[in-house]
């Protein structure tokens, strides 16, 4: 199979840079990255999935990398994020795809079968589980849960605040996010992340002694270079739509995901400290499987590329896509 290529695709009023691999006409797999990442975060999976016979489309999603970065906060709501990827299917003439997402990309792919049921053959999500609709706006729920404690999602809500911290030193931001996130069992790290006070998000993450074994300096520099050029505001604006997404999807209350679904997470992912995997049954009515990778952290498809790719291929093989 040839090496992955890059091209620009106009979709849903924005232009996305898309990494593409595999034969046109083969079953399509969309790979949706999270925060603060890029299509590059799927660099290990893209060639492997293409070699297995799939047509892979991995965009820099809106707000990131080589893609459009609209100024309006509401331009990053869940309706637009899912519609962007539907537009990629239209571009290649595909009726449906398997939607795979990590972190915020997982939120996008969990919503896709609810908003665009006819365009989704199956869903695979990493790190962020499927959750039932909250009874109150999400930021209200977070404030009730965390009180006066620091919580990064609430910190991200005010335009300009987190932007200034993260944009001030993109190398520090990426270094600490990649190497400074600690597993749920690290109590001192948990206390530091929750402690009330003026410190920002990156301030609370430890400066790693060195890079994790799973990422090279060259790979980290790719992220640093892109975020130095673009800043982090586009990605932060996704967080600023939590309540808007809740308000504008009220009609989805009670609807469930009926397509085959896979959830993959690392047991050392700090996201699992404030989400519950056991509530997936409340929103998923179709076939569902969960894969937990022992000791893996948040940057799952980069930390454990072989295990993630194997889980995805096993899932894909069991689907009737051809």
Curated annotation (Swiss-Prot):
One of its GO terms (biological process) is response to toxic substance. The keyword Hydrolase applies. Its EC number is 3.3.2.10. Homodimer. The record marks 152, 239 as: Contributes to the formation of an oxyanion binding site for the epoxide oxygen of substrate. This is Epoxide hydrolase A. Belongs to the AB hydrolase superfamily. Epoxide hydrolase family. It comes from the Bacteria. GO terms for molecular function: epoxide hydrolase activity; hydrolase activity; protein homodimerization activity. Could be involved in detoxification of extraneous host-cell epoxides. Catalyzes the hydrolysis of epoxide-containing substrates. The active site is at residues 103, 298. It comes from Mycobacterium tuberculosis (strain ATCC 25618 / H37Rv). Signal peptide: none annotated. It catalyses: an epoxide + H2O = an ethanediol. Residues 27-131 form the AB hydrolase-1 domain. The record marks 269 as: Plays an orienting role for the imidazole group of His-298. Keywords: Detoxification, Hydrolase. The gene is ephA. The lineage of its organism: Bacteria, Bacillati, Actinomycetota, Actinomycetes, Mycobacteriales.
């Amino acid at each position: 199979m040839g090496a992955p290529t890059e091209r620009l695709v106009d979709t849903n009023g924005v232009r996305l840079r898309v990494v593409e691999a595999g034969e046109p006409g083969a079953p399509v797999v969309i790979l949706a990255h999270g925060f603060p990442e890029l299509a590059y975060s799927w660099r290990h999976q893209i060639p492997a999935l293409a070699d297995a016979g799939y047509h892979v489309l991995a965009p820099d999603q809106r707000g990131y990398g080589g893609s459009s970065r609209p100024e309006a906060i509401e331009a990053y709501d869940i309706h637009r994020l899912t519609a962007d990827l539907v537009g990629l299917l239209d571009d290649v003439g595909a009726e449906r795809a398997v939607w795979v997402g990590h972190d915020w990309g997982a939120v996008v792919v969990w919503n896709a079968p609810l908003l665009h049921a006819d365009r989704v053959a199956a869903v695979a999500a990493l790190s962020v589980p499927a959750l039932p609709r909250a009874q109150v706006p999400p930021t209200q729920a977070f404030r009730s849960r965390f009180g006066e404690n620091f919580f990064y999602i609430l910190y991200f809500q005010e335009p300009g605040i987190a932007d200034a911290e993260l944009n001030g030193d993109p190398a520090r931001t990426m270094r600490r996010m990649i190497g400074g996130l600690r597993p749920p069992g690290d109590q001192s790290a948990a206390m530091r992340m929750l402690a009330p006070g003026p410190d920002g998000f990156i301030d609370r993450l430890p400066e790693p002694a060195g890079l994790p074994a799973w990422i090279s300096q060259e790979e980290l520099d790719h992220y640093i270079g892109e975020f130095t050029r673009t800043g982090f505001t586009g990605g932060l604006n996704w967080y600023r739509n939590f309540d808007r997404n809740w308000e504008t999807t009220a009609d989805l209350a009670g609807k469930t995901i009926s397509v085959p679904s896979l959830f993959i997470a690392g047991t050392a992912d700090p996201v699992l400290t404030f989400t519950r995997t056991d509530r997936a049954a409340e929103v998923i009515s179709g076939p569902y499987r969960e894969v937990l990778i022992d000791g893996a952290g948040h940057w799952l498809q980069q930390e454990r590329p072989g295990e993630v790719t194997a889980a995805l291929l096993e899932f894909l093989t069991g689907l009737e896509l051809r």
